[in-house]
Design a protein with these regions (language model features):
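Disulfide-rich extracellular domains of secreted proteins
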Residues: 1-3, 14, 30, 37-38, ...
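Flexible, glycine/charged-enriched surface loops at secondary-structure junctions
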Residues: 2-5, 123-134, 193-235
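N-terminal low-complexity or amphipathic/hydrophobic leaders
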Residues: 2-30
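Active-site cofactor/substrate anionic-group-binding motifs, chiefly glycine-
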Residues: 20-58
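Composition-driven recognition of glycine/serine/threonine/acidic- and proline-rich low-complexity segments
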Residues: 25-34, 77, 132-163
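Internal, conserved structured core segments that host functional sites
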Residues: 52-125
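A two-mode feature
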Residues: 157, 161-222
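Conserved small/polar residues in nucleotide/adenosyl-binding loops
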Residues: 243-245
Length: 245
């Protein structure tokens, strides 16, 4: 890395390094979790709200085939993040289901801004370190916001389902910068985050959702092992360099 470079890191490896893994098999689904999974997410969002708001066809397809095994996931969201995040039909609170083994999931990292600054100090060069999440930041009426619990300054965070619904009526700005070692503008943060995310999406081993697991690893979502995850090449970080013409 050289002075002026950007180091863009996906949130999951940071979370794992902090021990922020949760085993969903240890959670007993409540009636509320079952209702939110089946009636609210699968049927109301899959067949009514989703099509009306024009959410991605891929998301609608995935909602319509939600299995009963996701009851425990919704219970985790309810207990750890509350109803406003559990009401979101998918990708609740930025919890990552696709890059963890077995019934484990990865929560968002704790204090990503502090982590970004620590990493910059360890690198020892004048670089910008950014931690991002693929969940969207939206823009409406000149304001940036996200349903995620955390984001860089300038993006209103922790909006939960309200942010998700409002976002469908606004502009999707792409991936969300969670923390940054520098005080950068929201516009710059979004630009850099999306360049890195576009590169990661171009890779054959990219698993954007839990439903990508079977095509990449050749195994069911519930059968992911550490060995299976180790069998593919991961790209948890991307280095971006400015080219001066």
């Amino acid at each position: 890395m050289e002075d002026g470079d950007y180091l863009v890191i996906a949130e999951t490896p940071v979370s794992v390094s902090q021990g922020r893994l949760v085993d969903e098999s240890r959670y007993s689904p409540s009636l509320k979790a079952k209702f939110l999974t089946t009636v609210w997410s699968k049927y109301l969002w899959g067949y009514v709200f989703g099509p009306i708001l024009g959410i991605k066809k891929r998301t609608i397809k995935n909602l319509r085939r939600l299995p009963k095994e996701t009851y425990a996931h919704k219970e985790v969201v309810l207990q750890l993040y509350g109803l406003k995040h559990a009401l979101k039909p998918a990708s609740e609170a930025g919890i990552d289901l696709s890059n963890a083994p077995g019934s484990c999931v990865s929560l968002l990292p704790e204090n990503p801004q502090k982590v970004a600054k620590q990493l910059k100090a360890e690198i020892g060069k004048n670089v910008c370190v950014m931690i991002i999440d693929t969940d969207a930041t939206y823009k409406k009426n000149g304001k940036y916001f996200t349903g995620l619990p955390i984001a860089i300054d300038g993006i209103e965070a922790n909006k939960g389902v309200i942010g998700y619904v409002k976002g469908q009526l606004g502009e999707n700005m792409g991936s969300t910068p969670l923390g940054c070692s520098e005080n950068i503008s929201v516009e710059e943060g979004l630009k850099i985050a999306n360049i890195a995310e576009d590169y990661q999406k171009s890779l054959a081993t990219e698993m954007s959702t839990i439903h990508s697991v079977k095509s990449v690893l050749g195994t069911d979502e519930s059968s992911v092992t550490i060995e299976a995850l180790d069998s593919i090449t991961h790209t948890p970080a991307v280095i971006l360099s400015l080219i001066h013409i």
